[in-house]
């Protein structure tokens, strides 16, 4: 796994959290229902044999090869880490990290001091395109 090329930044003479170069995306990718069958934590015996979505494998490995950061962000628990890592390796996914324990239930609303973009997975990994959408923001 390659280390991300973070750029150190200062504001007002003080160091702030580093940033990725603008041309590199920091992808957080769900696992169940996004790159493979949707398997709930209550049925972990199915995780080792989950059906991979070939289009997801190809697209994520393409993004990795282009230098983007690939991190899986899943509702699977730490107890599922070993089977999940083995499954990703078996299918040939290239990635930088995996965050376990994402809150379950959807309806996510991410608040951050950095730019955040969201793409809802609707069944296939195509090219990403620009679209205008209505978003909720804090009142100024």
Functional labels for PLM-detected ranges:
Residues 2-140:
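HAD-like aspartate-dependent phosphatase fold
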């Amino acid at each position: 796994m390659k280390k991300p090329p973070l750029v150190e930044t200062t504001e007002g003479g003080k160091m702030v959290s580093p940033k990725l170069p603008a041309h590199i995306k920091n992808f957080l990718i769900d696992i169940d229902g996004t790159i493979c069958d949707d398997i709930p934590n209550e049925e972990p015996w199915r995780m080792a044999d989950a059906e991979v979505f070939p289009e997801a494998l190809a697209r994520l490995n393409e993004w990795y090869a282009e230098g983007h950061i690939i991190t899986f962000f899943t509702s699977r628990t730490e107890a599922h880490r070993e089977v999940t890592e083995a499954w990703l390796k078996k299918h040939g996914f290239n990635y930088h990290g995996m965050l376990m324990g994402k809150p379950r239930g959807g309806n996510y609303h991410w608040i951050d001091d950095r730019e955040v973009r969201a793409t809802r997975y609707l069944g296939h990994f195509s090219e990403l395109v620009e679209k205008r959408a209505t978003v909720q923001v804090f009142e100024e």
